[in-house]
A protein has these predicted regions:
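AAA+ P-loop NTPase catalytic core and its hallmark functional loops
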Residues: 2-211
């Protein structure tokens, strides 16, 4: 794909040179399946100059401590919830965290009031399901399921707009790190590196309170 024709490239595309330079000079310990160490992720978000002279552009102007706590939360295998008013860079930060850690910010679920549980778990290609019955070929994985299978970060936008019963399904996935597929008598067990970054709007309190 020619990025000159793309109105808004993904973070891992727009800042590919910076991510490559950070990975090449990153000698610090990395959690399993992380592309960069936590220290390098901080540098990617807040900016700095690498030992080889590469300038890293700041992606976030704000409290360094908040960024460090967010990254430490993910590094200790806990999901991250970014809460704030509209326009406070929650989505921007979540995208760049996923890009720096997993190299992929596209495993995204957009929360809405009508979001079904299948959007967090899996669905079916009904044409194949009717023709072949339940099979792996007929299964349509959600972004969260793909993140579990590949050890990457899934992003969930506007968590409080999602119905409470669907939120409950997410809690089970995060606590058990397993997604049962009873139709196939199978399950997906999350690989190391899997995690979730969710955002929530302060002004949506009362729409669907967090479970």
């Amino acid at each position: 794909m020619n990025n000159l024709t793309v109105l808004r490239p993904h973070a891992e595309q727009a800042y590919a040179a910076e991510l490559t330079a950070l990975a090449a000079t990153d000698l610090h310990p990395k959690p399993l399946n992380w592309n960069l160490s936590p220290r390098a992720v901080v540098t990617y978000l807040l900016g700095g100059t690498l030992e080889d002279g590469t300038e890293i552009e700041p992606k976030y102007y704000g409290d360094k401590r908040l960024v460090e706590v967010a990254i430490a939360t993910l590094a200790t295998d806990r999901a991250l919830l970014l809460v704030g008013l509209p326009g406070t860079a929650k989505t921007w930060v979540s995208e760049h965290l996923a890009a720096a850690i997993s190299g992929d910010s596209t495993l995204l679920v957009q929360g809405t009031a009508g979001l079904p549980e299948e959007a967090l778990r899996y669905g079916w290609n009904y044409a194949r399901l009717l023709a072949e019955g339940p099979s792996e070929a007929a299964l349509t994985p959600s972004p969260v399921m793909l993140a579990m299978q590949t050890g990457k970060i899934a992003r969930i936008e506007e968590l409080t707009r999602i119905p409470s019963d669907v939120q409950d399904a997410l809690i089970t996935l995060l606590s058990e790190k397993t997604l049962p597929i009873p139709e196939l008598n199978n399950e997906v067990q999350a690989l190391p590196g899997f995690n979730v970054i969710a955002t929530a709007n302060d002004r949506d309190r009362g729409v669907n309170e967090l479970s």
